[in-house]
Amino acid sequence: MARGSGAGYRCPVPEGHTIHRLAARHAELFAGDKVHATSPQGRFAEGAARLTGTVLEGTEAYGKHLLHHHAGELTLHVHLGLYGRITDGPGEPPPPVGQIRLRLSSDTHWLDLRGPTACELLTPPEVAALRDRLGPDPLRPDADPDRAYARIRRAATPLAALLLDQSVVAGTGLIFVTEALFRAGLPPTLPGRELSPAGWRDLWADLVALMTVAVERGRIDTVREIHLPEAMGRAPRVDRHGGEVYVYRRPGAPCHVCGTEVSRGELAGRNLYWCATCQAD
């Protein structure tokens, strides 16, 4: 992504890859610059005043959490949640429209944050506490998958629920979990304690691979080459989430591998999708 490559960069569904893309984008636009911060909405006015005049020293993503590290041991913590979004652009920012929680600007660029679940300033101990309550992030080089497996192998909880628990694995959302379980041939209801160490190593490696590709492409693609539309002679997927997937949001459609109708169920208030043949108990 070239610096200043155009206005209106908007985040897609905020799974972990999106936050890593945003962290890289914001470092590219603002790192090393003195920033000015305002809160047109007013809800972050005190925090914005503390940020104004500081230099953004670096950015970081941990799971679904975005961190801006500023001089003076100030860290801006953002969690987009379901409704948050960020836009940015070059030059002077436009007149504020809508509920802008935070507007950050430098001499060359601006960004607007709307609708986040969290927008707050953290001290170094609070940043450490945030990291401590999160599981390993497959996109981080410091991730320790054994720490996640220590939780999984003791749990009777369904594997899908464990993988969606951010204290077990950070950054994985419903699309990555649904698709990784399909690719591994594992039913989403499998109790965590029934997953073997080798099975976990393979599943973790696939999550790393899928999420890394998503960072590079800006969308989630999970189908292997032999199941791409051009290889199978089928129409491309049409969905606001984009990307080619096996089972996510495809209930009743034929499985790309075996032709069985994709199933849908509910787990802890979340929709799950799976193939009863490819992911048999």
What label would you give each PLM region?
Residues 2-281:
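Structured catalytic/nucleic-acid-binding cores of DNA maintenance enzymes
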